[in-house]
């Protein structure tokens, strides 16, 4: 893997780690409202870029795939944003980044061979997740559902990467990014309407944060991961944000003085060790 790819992955990791901090900072803006404007702004920025540098049309085979990828990406952000508001940043980011576990399972279900080392890694990771999920602090109230939503968001991002790995084989990254972000925005809009919310529940001063979310964690973060998925396996790409719980929790510790739950500290090593084992035995490129 070239140094350029390593640099892109590093920038993507730092960028996506800023999401949880912004969600906590703008507490008065509903989670789904934040998620919607994040995706819409990211899509608009990429569409504006396309005016200067026109892109090719999406092939017929990939149009349906982009719809599915965008749907799962929208659900990922909707679930993750709500999860961060309902549990600690440490637990939410930890559970949301279980994507490598799900991509490995999905790869196996699609007929790809999965080694015994990968299976062992999955079991270790699941054990750690159980510690985080069913500990005393998270077994009741909002923390419980925050953890559930965050875990489901991990499955959704895994599905997104599975579709992206096929789409990016013959689709430019800008073209894929602007399309999948737009479909994700529409998905979040529908979820917001069905849940009785509004995408206009914000103040003018919040707009700068929508722009920030669209540029930094979306374009510099997820869109850079989309770029790399052409050269790496879905499991390898899904593993990159695993450093997010540490970085995001550190941000929140210094900015908001948020205490990291003991259960998250205990469960995290199991999750990380299991995922590292999974990733090291899942890379195909």
Language model: regions and residue ranges:
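Juxtamembrane helix-entry segments on the extracytoplasmic side of multipass membrane proteins
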Residues: 2-5, 27-36, 58-63, 134-156, ...
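Juxtamembrane C-cap of transmembrane helices in multi-pass membrane transport proteins
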Residues: 15-29, 41, 78-87, 95, ...
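Hydrophobic/small/kink-forming positions within alpha-helical transmembrane segments
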Residues: 17, 47, 70, 74-78, ...
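Helix-helix packing/entry segments at the starts of transmembrane helices
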Residues: 37, 92-98, 164-185, 218-254
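Hydrophobic transmembrane alpha-helices of multi-pass small-molecule transport proteins
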Residues: 46, 50, 67, 73, ...
């Amino acid at each position: 893997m070239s140094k350029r790819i390593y640099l892109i992955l590093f920038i993507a990791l730092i960028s996506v780690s800023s999401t949880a901090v912004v969600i906590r900072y703008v507490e008065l803006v509903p989670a789904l409202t934040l998620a919607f404007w994040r995706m819409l702004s990211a899509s608009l920025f990429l569409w504006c870029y396309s005016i200067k540098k026109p892109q090719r049309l999406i092939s017929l085979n990939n149009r349906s795939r982009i719809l599915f990828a965008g749907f799962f990406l929208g659900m990922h952000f909707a679930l993750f944003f709500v999860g961060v508001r309902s549990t600690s940043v440490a637990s939410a980011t930890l559970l949301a980044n279980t994507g490598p576990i799900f991509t490995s399972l999905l790869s196996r279900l699609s007929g790809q061979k999965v080694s015994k080392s990968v299976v062992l890694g999955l079991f270790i990771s699941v054990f750690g997740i159980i510690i985080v999920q069913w500990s005393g602090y998270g077994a009741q109230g909002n923390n419980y559902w925050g953890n559930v939503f965050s875990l489901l968001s991990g499955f959704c991002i895994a599905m997104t990467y599975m579709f992206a790995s096929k789409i990016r084989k013959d689709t430019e990254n800008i073209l894929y990014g602007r399309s999948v972000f737009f479909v994700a925005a529409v998905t979040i809009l529908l979820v917001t309407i069905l849940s009785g919310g509004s995408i206009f529940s914000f103040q003018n001063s919040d707009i700068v944060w929508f722009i920030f979310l669209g540029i930094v964690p979306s374009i510099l973060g997820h869109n850079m991961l989309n770029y790399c998925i052409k050269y790496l396996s879905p499991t390898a790409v899904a593993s990159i944000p695993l450093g997010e719980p540490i970085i995001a929790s550190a941000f929140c510790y210094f900015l908001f003085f948020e205490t990291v739950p003991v259960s998250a500290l205990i469960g995290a090593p199991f999750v990380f060790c299991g995922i590292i084992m999974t990733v090291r035995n899942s890379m195909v490129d």
